[in-house]
Amino acid sequence: MSMQITRQMLSAGAAMLGFGSVSSGSRAAFTLPPLPYPYDRNEPAIDTQTMRLHHDAHHANYVNNLNQALAAAGGGWASRPLLHILANLDGIPESVRAAVRSNGGGHANHSMFWDVMGGKGGRPAGELAEAIARDLGGFENLQNAFNNAGLKIGGSGWVFVTVDKAGKLALATRPNQETPLTEGGRVLFGNDVWEHAYYLKYQNRRADYLKAWWSVLNWDRIAARYAAAKAGALAI
C-alpha cells in the first residue's frame, strides 16, 4: 500500500467519521459516524442489542454533548478537527474543558472502536505481526497482557495498543473516556471496558467479554491503520 493511497484512505475515513481532516478548519458540528457494518456483524461475541444501544445511544450522547460544550467554548473551537481539540485542551475555557475532554475522548474512542471490529478475528500478519512480536512479545503475549490490563481497570475505561510514527507499539490503559490522543499519541486499536459495552450479554463476566472480543477484530483494517500511523496519516 503506497503512502499516497494510505493518506487518501485515512482522509476519506476521517471525513466519514465526522472528524474533518487534520488541517481543515470549517465544520459546523461533529456527527455520529454510521456503523460500518450491520449491527449483528459481531454476533455472537457482541450481541445486536448491545451494538445498537452502544452506537445509537451511548456514542450519540458523546457527540451531542461534545457539540454543546464546544458551542459554549466559543472562540472557533466548534469548527476545529477533533484531533486538534484533544491535543490542545489547555486552550479550552476551563468552564467546559472537562466536558470537552470527556465527550471528545468518548467520540474518538468509540469511532476507533467501530473501525477495528466487524472482522473474523484470527491473527495479524505481515509487518504488523512482526511489530507485535518485536514490541509486545508476540500475539499470545499481547492477548494475555491486554486482557489482564482490562481486568485491572477499576470501574470504566479502555485498553489500547498505541503506535508512534516509527511503528513502535505499546500497551496502555486509560480511565473513563481518556485517550492517548490528548498526549500526542495514536491508537492502533482498543477495547471498551465500560459496562455498557458488554453487560447485557456478559453481566459481570468482563473476562469472558475480553476473550470473546478478539474474535471480531478486523486485522486488515488494523494493518491499514498501522501503515497510516507510520505515514503520519492516522488522524484518530
Question: What kind of region is each of these model predictions?
Answer:
Residues S21, D115-P124, K201-R206:
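Short helix-capping/linker segments at secondary-structure and domain boundaries
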Residues D208-I236:
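N-terminal targeting pre-sequences for secretion and organelle import
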Residues N148-R205, K211-D220:
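An amphipathic alpha-helical core segment
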Residues R52-V63:
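Structured secondary-structure scaffolds
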Residues S21-I46:
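C-terminal segment of N-terminal export signals and the immediately downstream linker at the start
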Residues S2-S26:
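N-terminal export signals
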